[in-house]
Amino acid sequence: MITIYSEKHRLRNAKTELFGGQLVSPFENPSRADIVLERVQSENLGDVIAPREFGMEPVLALHDAGFVEFLRMAWDEWSKTGYEGEAIPTCWPARRMSQRIPNFIEGKVGYYSLSSETSINKGTWEAAVASKDVVLAGAELLLSGNENGVFSLCRPPGHHAAFDMFGGYCFLNNAAIAAQWFRDNGIDRVSILDVDFHHGNGTQDIFYEREDVLYLSLHGDPRDAFPHFSGYPEETGQNAGEGATFNWPMPPGTQFKKWCDCLKESLAKIDQFGAGVIVVSLGVDTFEKDPISFFKLKSEDFLSIGKLIAELQRPTLFVMEGGYDINELGINVVNVLQAFDG
């Protein structure tokens, strides 16, 4: 399996995350991609190639233009104020407040953000653009017809990024951008299977009223897990998209058997949908030792995940999302990919 990777991910090297009432070193950091890449290479998974540049048209096909411009200029505007730290959201347009976009950068950061754990540093925009190129290079390669599966080692991740909102370590929605690219290049039906521990609120938001992209997510119950306000089973799509969104929230302590039963249900729905391509939002923070999650999957379980997805015999793009146990992160990711490859 070919892996797409860009060194530009290192530009996203934030020093600040608000977690448990404290400012901590971010869980989402450059070492994550390094660890996964090292495992890909040590296991001889396949060639590792750099992406070409795809421009901004695929981004603007899904994301609000004002939001994209905000991300592009956020660090410059923030640093010009004289602030010495990273841009952290502190004020939001809460219930019954105006939804106007402020002029001052502090207000803009709040307006366009989901949550306060994700700061913006100097290289965030450049890294997010490169991550988008990584996923599109993977999509392009998969559509060439020479590969059954491709791995886009995206960093920063993307599935929490909505139409006009960043957060959850995400800025541009890589999986959604790839899905739209497939649609624009002749694939009538695309399925996005999100196996990250956290619900992909951003991906759901982007496709919630569409019938041509099926979104399925297996995740921690939002009553107990981030992002808390998205991912309930009654969220099934709206208007033309009614019935094209499926959520399987699961409680703390969920073991692989329960999780796998939900995976099998989701794969059956993908098969019934008749997807021409599957995009897998590959988060491995379902692992039992993950520091910010509460499922109990073991490393060997990720082999089963790859095998089950492969049984659908559909072209599949794996897109890196979460996973924060650095000791076994690479093992868990590559287990999925190797098992899929057979």
Describe the residue ranges of each PLM region.
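HDAC/HDAC-like amidohydrolase catalytic core signature
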Residues: M1-L193, H198-G342
